[in-house]
């Protein structure tokens, strides 16, 4: 007669373990989405570097040496910039797809929510304007910094 009681305990233990695993995984899911998105952005920037000569040569505000906790703000400055294809050649469609990928919002994070409270970050207009190649290098550097901070 004791067997059903033990079986119930085992089933309950397994359910607790399973639900704890699911809860643990879902709490990290948003973080994983951010990391995946940031790594995709690195690839996108690298691809855009191949088309530097096909982009409008306009000088663009490019954040550098971004203060800690101002990364999201600086990233949004990069996203607000109007990157444009310089010609209507074969590469225009590819460039436009890459630019759209850069403009997609990042998944929400706790750090992003904290940043909105009480921290004063530089405005987009305050950043020095740079040629497109340096703009892309600084964007990549910022994304790498965001990945590093996310992992630490």
UniProtKB/Swiss-Prot annotation:
The keyword Cytoplasm is assigned to this record: no
GO biological process, one term: germinal center B cell differentiation
GO molecular function: cytokine activity; cytokine receptor binding
The keyword Signal is assigned to this record: yes
Positions of disulphide bridges: 70-121, 77-124
Chief location: secreted
Signal peptide positions (record): 1-23
Locations listed in the record: Secreted
Gene Ontology cellular-component annotations: extracellular space
UniProt keywords, alphabetically: Cytokine, Disulfide bond, Secreted, Signal
Reported function: Cytokine with immunoregulatory activity. May promote the transition between innate and adaptive immunity. Induces the production of IgG(1) and IgG(3) in B-cells. Implicated in the generation and maintenance of T follicular helper (Tfh) cells and the formation of germinal-centers. Together with IL6, control the early generation of Tfh cells and are critical for an effective antibody response to acute viral infection. May play a role in proliferation and maturation of natural killer (NK) cells in synergy with IL15.
Protein family (similarity comment): Belongs to the IL-15/IL-21 family.
Stated name of the protein: Interleukin-21
Organism ancestry: Eukaryota, Metazoa, Chordata, Craniata, Vertebrata
């Amino acid at each position: 007669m004791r067997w059903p009681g033990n079986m119930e305990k085992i089933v309950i233990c397994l359910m607790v373990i399973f639900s704890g695993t699911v809860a643990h995984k879902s709490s990290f899911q948003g973080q994983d989405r951010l990391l995946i998105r940031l790594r995709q952005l690195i690839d996108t920037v690298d691809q855009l570097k191949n088309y530097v000569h096909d982009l409008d040569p306009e000088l663009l505000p490019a954040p550098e040496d971004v203060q800690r906790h101002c990364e999201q703000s600086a990233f949004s400055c990069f996203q607000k910039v109007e990157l444009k294809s310089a010609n209507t050649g074969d590469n225009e469609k590819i460039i436009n797809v890459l630019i759209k990928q850069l403009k997609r919002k990042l998944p929400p994070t706790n750090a992003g929510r904290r940043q909105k409270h009480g921290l004063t970050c530089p405005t987009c207009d305050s950043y020095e304007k740079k040629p497109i190649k340096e703009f892309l290098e600084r964007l990549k550097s910022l994304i790498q910094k965001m990945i590093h901070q996310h992992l630490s």
